């Protein structure tokens, strides 16, 4: 046999081979989704040829009719799904069906192994392989206008064969033949196929035809009658018929007596999806079930949608739209390579393109749906769309309707909780990016607070609980609720009875940079300088006195720490902590610095000027600070002061959420303090080290005047 007959054999890419093995060797109850996936792929191929034909009409000369055809063959145990779409070249078959893994292949396998439903397969871009749920062999013949007809064949044994074929039926498009497994022949039944198409694919925008077997009555003569008929016909041909009277009528009666009726089987195509596009219908006439089915066919989701918005706009421009909020966020929602959104654009019921970036801002990329415009030209390109004023108006309306939809979701507390768990990052990204709708979006924010630790609260509810003398909204950003709740920064604010908002999502940092105020109340971080708490005259007086009293200590500490801090000041925010590190109002917070340091592709030049300018604030009421002041007042040149100040500073860095530049040095200071507390002298330590290593330890810095001041250290404790 020639190579053309044998074909070329290719190995499946490793991840695809693993996926197929998982599909074949694991039991799944809802195998019917294979048909939905194959029909969906056919629909995509038809979309592509129709879009191409808008600018190149000659592309349709190989077949003007666009449809999907399903043909079951019980005798051969095969099920064929054919479309007249764009087709695939030989290279497409090799790459798309085996040698190049889609980005979602690995993610889908991980999801499956974690217990996810097989019906999610379409969301990960690997729906074709679901064919192996019901087939032990799959043959794909495909004809692209730019290539000959090629056939892909595999029994999922780790490889596939590509060969050139001649298929007169396939002038353009793809024909997938599934060799159905012995225990899956139910999928060859017309009833079952109709049921699946109605359930999953009735809103596909192209005719789905099913080749059905039907019966009709046919009159046939018995054997004798057949012979007589032949003779009579022969005689009639030889002579002319002269009599047309009684004799003819008698002949006719005799003829009728000799005929019998039999059931004749024949095949014809039956269209399964005659429903007109759902978005063109009146919303009042559409049931929730119909919306759910359309959503599933549109999105490849296996769950119902969370909410829907169906509307039309008339006036200077006309368009209809149907928008859905899913139950859960897709696995790759914020991946850079992900298509921007899932909105399909139609012009006068003709599909133009999917994932139309210009229709929705990026923060609403989770919204799925269709937009059907009456005003855009049919042959519009992506480049023209970017300049289209019509599209800008449509986009503005869509965003407005999405916000209305979120309002409707918020009316049901449980539904909004589900929504917020999945899409809170999108809302916060919107606040960061969309200045026009920032105020409206802020109404959807929910946070845990010092007064509401079990249930999230809105900014509106926070404002309603504010004290009479409270003029600002207080918040703290951090890594976790536990960390911020026990932070030194919230001590006095909470002690005064003011509520503090806990922001623990990394994106909160970006969000709050843009959200400066809510309802006329300024948002203030309790970790930054300039925190003003309502105070009585007595408290103000005490604070001023403390500033004077500790002025000298602040100066000494600043001299010791030098460039490590911008300034040292008396604090009005601490209760039980001796000191803390606050940042300038316009620089990064400790949490933001942590986030930025974690960015693999960060701009290191930004770190220089945006990194927090650190201010050390001391608590004038804390015993450690009081004792330290006394020591400085007694002897400015006290050798232990420097080590104590550095240790206080480094500990404050850690408790304020910063990282240490030299953790080892800090650790050695702590160990040295422990030794002092245990009355271990330097000589004893050196002897112990020497007995083990034979060398004196020179890597750990000595505390200045440690031995002579060991007793005085205890006073500070």
Curated annotation (Swiss-Prot):
Q: Where does ATP bind?
A: 41, 83, 102, 128, 382
Q: Name one GO molecular function term.
A: ATP-dependent protein folding chaperone
Q: Where is the composition biased (Acidic residues)?
A: 240-251
Specify the domain of life of the species encoding this protein.
Eukaryota
- UniProt cross-references to Pfam families, sorted A to Z: HATPase_c_3, HSP90
Q: Which residues form a coiled coil?
A: none
Region (Disordered) spans which residues?
215-263, 690-717
Question: What family does the database annotate?
Answer: Belongs to the heat shock protein 90 family.
Free-text note regarding domains: The TPR repeat-binding motif mediates interaction with TPR repeat-containing proteins.
Q: State its role.
A: Molecular chaperone that promotes the maturation, structural maintenance and proper regulation of specific target proteins involved for instance in cell cycle control and signal transduction. Undergoes a functional cycle that is linked to its ATPase activity. This cycle probably induces conformational changes in the client proteins, thereby causing their activation. Interacts dynamically with various co-chaperones that modulate its substrate recognition, ATPase cycle and chaperone function.
Protein name in the entry: Heat shock protein 90
């Amino acid at each position: 046999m020639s190579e053309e007959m044998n074909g070329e054999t290719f190995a499946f890419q490793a991840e695809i081979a693993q996926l197929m093995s998982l599909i074949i060797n694991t039991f799944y109850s809802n195998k019917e989704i294979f048909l939905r996936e194959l029909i969906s792929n056919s629909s995509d191929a038809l979309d592509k040829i129709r879009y191409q034909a808008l600018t190149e009409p000659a592309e349709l000369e190989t077949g003007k009719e666009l449809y999907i055809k399903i043909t079951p063959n019980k005798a051969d145990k095969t099920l064929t799904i054919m479309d007249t779409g764009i087709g695939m070249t030989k290279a497409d078959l090799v790459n798309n069906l085996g040698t190049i893994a889609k980005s979602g292949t690995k993610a889908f396998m991980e999801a499956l192994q974690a217990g996810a439903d097989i019906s999610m397969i379409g969301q990960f871009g690997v729906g074709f392989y679901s064919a192996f749920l019901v087939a032990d062999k799959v043959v794909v013949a495909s004809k692209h206008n730019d290539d000959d007809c090629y056939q892909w064949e595999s029994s999922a044994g780790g490889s596939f064969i590509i060969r050139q074929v001649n298929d007169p039926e396939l002038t353009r498009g793809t024909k997938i033949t599934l060799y159905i497994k012995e225990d899956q022949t139910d999928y060859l039944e017309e009833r079952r196929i109709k049921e699946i198409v109605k359930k999953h694919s009735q809103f596909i925008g192209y005719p789905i035809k099913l080749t059905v077997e039907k019966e009709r009555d046919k009159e046939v003569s018995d054997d004798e009658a057949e012979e007589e008929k032949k003779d009579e016909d022969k005689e009639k041909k030889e002579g002319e018929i002269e009599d047309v009277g009684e004799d003819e009528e008698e002949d006719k009666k005799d003829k009728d007596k000799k005929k019998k009726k039999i059931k004749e089987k024949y095949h014809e195509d039956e269209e399964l999806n005659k429903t007109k596009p759902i978005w063109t219908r009146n919303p009042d006439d559409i049931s929730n079930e119909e919306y759910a089915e359309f959503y599933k066919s549109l999105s490849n989701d296996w769950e119902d949608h969370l909410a829907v918005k169906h509307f039309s706009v008339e006036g200077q421009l006309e368009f209809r739209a149907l928008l859905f909020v899913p139950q859960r966020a897709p696995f790759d929602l914020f991946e850079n390579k992900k298509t921007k959104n899932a909105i399909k654009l139609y012009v006068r019921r003709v599909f133009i393109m999917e994932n139309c970036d210009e229709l929705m801002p990026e923060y609403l990329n989770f919204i799925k749906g269709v937009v059907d415009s009456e005003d855009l030209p049919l042959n519009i390109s992506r480049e023209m769309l970017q300049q289209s004023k019509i599209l800008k108006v449509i986009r503005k309306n869509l965003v407005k309707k999405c916000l209305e939809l979120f309002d409707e979701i918020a009316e049901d507390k449980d539904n909004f909780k589900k929504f917020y768990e999945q899409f809170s990052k999108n809302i916060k990204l919107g606040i960061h990016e969309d200045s026009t709708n920032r105020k409206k979006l802020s109404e959807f924010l929910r946070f845990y607070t010092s007064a509401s630790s079990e249930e999230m609260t809105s900014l509106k509810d926070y404002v309603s609980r504010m004290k009479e003398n409270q003029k600002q909204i207080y918040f703290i950003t951090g890594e976790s609720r536990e960390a911020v709740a026990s932070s030194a920064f919230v001590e006095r604010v909470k002690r005064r009875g003011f509520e503090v908002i806990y922001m623990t999502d990394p994106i909160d940092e970006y969000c709050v940079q843009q959200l400066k105020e809510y309802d006329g109340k300024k948002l203030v971080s309790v970790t930054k300088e300039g925190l003003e708490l309502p105070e009585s005259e007595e408290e103000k007086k005490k604070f001023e006195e403390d500033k004077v009293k500790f002025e000298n200590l602040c100066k000494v500490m600043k001299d010791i720490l030098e460039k490590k801090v911008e300034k040292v000041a008396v604090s009005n925010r601490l209760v039980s902590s001796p000191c803390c590190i606050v940042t300038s109002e316009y620089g990064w917070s400790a949490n933001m610095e942590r986030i930025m340091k974690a960015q693999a592709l960060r701009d290191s030049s930004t770190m220089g000027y945006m990194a927090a300018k650190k201010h050390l604030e001391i608590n004038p009421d804390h015993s450690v600070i009081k004792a330290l002041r006394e020591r400085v007042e007694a002897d400015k040149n006290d050798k232990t002061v420097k080590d104590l100040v550095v240790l206080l500073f480094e500990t404050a860095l850690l408790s304020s959420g910063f990282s240490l530049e030299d953790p080892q040095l800090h650790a050695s200071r702590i160990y040295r303090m422990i030794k002092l507390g245990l009355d271990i002298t330097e000589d004893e330590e050196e002897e112990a080290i020497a007995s083990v290593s034979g060398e004196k330890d020179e890597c750990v810095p000595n505390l200045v005047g440690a031995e002579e001041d060991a007793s005085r250290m205890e006073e500070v404790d």
